[in-house]
């Protein structure tokens, strides 16, 4: 069967009321970006008027009558296009569409029978025809078209039967300026279009949890920047590359991510020297949050995202999280807070991050770990011990921010946008 277009199905966007148009525009923009990878350099046009003509040199995105269609060029890679669309948040279903000219009902019935036969080799199925007559000059209404096509399929394939309540096959027929036939629904990722919910800063480590947390927030429409806390020479270049690779995996859904590589070594060593060792983790986390929030303020991020899960480790008890939160003014999103580890691993595997996450390269969070970390820290006690850091900590934090190395990480690119030296020179 030749598919000339894909119907894009969405769920939540359709109930956004007066804001629906804005969400649709953001969805179309993300589809536009995704299809650029499939167009071989050909243009991708986004059109909103009814009856927009197909551009033979590339893909056309057509929004009309409550539908979004991706019209395809004469030659394209079906699997590549489906894969691209399955990485666009906001899409819940992708329907391959066969398009034909408007013809009399007899010819339409014959075409529908051929379409049904090619789509379903096993004809022992129940089906229902669902017609929409948007072209009001067509001589039959929707119910009459349903009856004619249904009768034709039953006659051609007597092993089938009609079930209007729970059919195994739903054959859709839309009569517009042309006739659209479709049946299969390929699942999309769901969620909301990237950018529709604002922008947030992900604290990205090399573990399993934080990439999943970032992916889940991106699925709800957040555009992501990320910050990684590096601790050379205690962490290796391979640990940094692992985080870059994880950012690249997430970018399949989000587009390019600005990854801030922060040298955290001097801060960690200073905390290790000045503070009780059972409080190392919680105090280090508090300074990570301070630095992440400072970068968020520079980059117009409206929230922080972490991969914390309640009770998973000592720093993720209720009291520990409350003490960590006390240094933040931005909201902190923890989408994994009630997830079991197995749930997180399942999602990590589904998004393709797991094999990279389990590579054996330590990050800064695993280097300076106390044997018996405090699980019920008291905010007043932690703040008192942080006063031991007053002599140098502000200067060390400022140095870490001034030497922030910014990388742009995408599916096809990994490049340094600003080196530590460039940032330092700009701060002088």
Language model features by range: what are they?
Residues 352-360:
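A short alpha-helix-loop-beta-strand transition element characteristic
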Residues 202, 226-228, 261, 306, ...:
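Structural beta-sheet core signal
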Residues 312, 360-368:
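Small/polar glycine-rich anion-binding or flexible loop at a beta-alpha turn
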Residues 207:
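Conserved G/P- and acidic residue-centered "switch" motifs that form tight phosphate/ATP-binding loops
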Residues 247-273, 363-364:
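A conserved beta-strand->alpha-helix junction
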Residues 148-153, 190-197, 268-269, 273-346, ...:
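Active-site adenylate/phosphate-handling loop in enzymes that bind or generate adenylated species
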Residues 1-201, 211-257, 326, 374-379, ...:
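RNA-binding accessory domains that recognize and position tRNA/RNA substrates
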